[in-house]
């Protein structure tokens, strides 16, 4: 299996990306035949020398440009054809690689993948599936930011693709699907969610109805469907809340010696709780619906997060997620219109 890694994308690139690649290759549980490190060749070689690392499974692919985080997605893809993200996607398009991993500009990764790879037959819009911790295992929010404006058929597509991913990659036998709304009743929500509710009822998916924000963590649900605007706000709000809670907890623990002693006793419990919600554990989010596997990592990805993003890419390829998506989209063609 060959995977392209955009080593120039991310807040801590290229060091974190290259270290993550090393960790992935050293992990026997991750199936990677070769990793293509896409970036400035001199910079990559310098970093590998600094880390005193050499591996026959690594190949450097030179790219002359970098898409910065603030740049316009579509514009950057069209004007920076030799950027690391574009070159990495080209490797998938040509068949030299089966997947791409990037922690760079999310919009650029989405634009490059959809423009160059095109969508799987039957897929109108690709969607990002971002995992959140849930009592039933990972709960995938689809779409988490690829498209801020969506039609009912797009959300139905997200539900189908999310279910395929949960079943074949995450091992959920009969994935539970919920529709993000402001109340459980089917009459609640916007015109969009009410129409999508009807489509999901007819879809044959394991649809449990509307879910609210608190259901993301409390209710057994594997796929939560929403448009990219809502999904991205939910995802970032959850991340910010978790970060703030642990910050406040640390401050309050330091307030008295007794609390500090208690914290030492409960240290392992705090560590386990933090790990459940740590984005590094999940690695990255798949862009479902494009003709190739694209995994989008957190902008501040650490080496461990990069390693796990490579693992996610490997598993998506190994479980043939895209052929399964094409099959299910064809089966639901009448509903998708």
What are these regions (language model features)?
Residues 1-5, 11-15, 30-32, 46, ...:
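N-terminal charge/polar-biased segments
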Residues 6, 37-39, 59-61, 102-104, ...:
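Short beta-strand segments
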Residues 13-16, 28-36, 42-45, 51, ...:
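Glycine-rich phosphate/diphosphate-binding loop of Rossmann-like nucleotide-binding domains
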Residues 13-17, 82-95, 99-113, 120, ...:
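Short glycine/serine/threonine-rich phosphate/pyrophosphate-binding segments
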Residues 53-97:
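Phosphate/nucleotide-donor binding subsite
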Residues 91-110, 188, 193-199, 203-274:
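Glycine-rich phosphate-binding loop
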Residues 114-127, 131-141, 223-224, 228-337:
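Glycine-rich phosphate/nucleotide-binding loop
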């Amino acid at each position: 299996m060959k995977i392209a890694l955009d080593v120039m994308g991310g807040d801590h690139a290229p060091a974190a990306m290259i270290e993550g690649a090393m960790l992935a290759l050293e992990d026997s549980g991750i199936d990677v035949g070769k990793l293509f490190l896409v970036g400035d060749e001199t910079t990559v070689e310098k970093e590998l020398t600094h880390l005193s690392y050499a591996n026959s499974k690594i190949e450097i692919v030179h790219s002359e440009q970098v898409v910065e985080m603030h740049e316009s997605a579509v514009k950057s893809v069209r004007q920076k054809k030799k950027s690391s993200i574009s070159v990495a996607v080209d490797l998938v398009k040509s068949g030299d690689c089966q997947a791409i991993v990037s922690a760079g500009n999310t919009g650029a990764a989405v634009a490059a993948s959809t423009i160059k790879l095109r969508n799987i037959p039957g897929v109108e819009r690709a969607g990002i599936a971002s995992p959140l911790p849930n009592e039933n295992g990972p709960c995938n929010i689809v779409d988490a930011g690829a498209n801020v404006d969506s039609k009912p058929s797009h959300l139905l597509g997200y539900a189908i693709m999310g279910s395929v991913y949960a079943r074949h990659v995450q091992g959920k036998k009969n994935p539970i699907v919920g529709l993000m709304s402001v109340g459980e009743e089917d009459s609640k929500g916007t015109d969009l969610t009410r129409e999508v509710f009807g489509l999901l009822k007819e879809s044959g998916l394991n649809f449990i109805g509307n879910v609210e924000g608190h259901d993301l963590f409390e209710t057994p649900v594997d796929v939560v469907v929403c448009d990219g605007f809502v999904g991205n706000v939910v995802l970032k709000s959850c991340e910010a809340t978790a970060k703030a809670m642990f910050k406040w907890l640390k401050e309050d623990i330091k307030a008295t010696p007794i609390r500090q002693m208690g914290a030492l006793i409960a240290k392992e419990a705090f560590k386990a709780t933090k790990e459940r919600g740590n984005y590094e554990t999940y690695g990255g989010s798949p862009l479902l619906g494009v003709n190739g596997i694209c995994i989008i990592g957190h902008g501040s990805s650490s080496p461990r997060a990069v390693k796990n993003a490579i693992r996610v890419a490997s598993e998506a390829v190994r479980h043939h997620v895209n052929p399964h998506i094409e099959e299910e989209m064809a089966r639901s063609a009448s509903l998708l219109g």
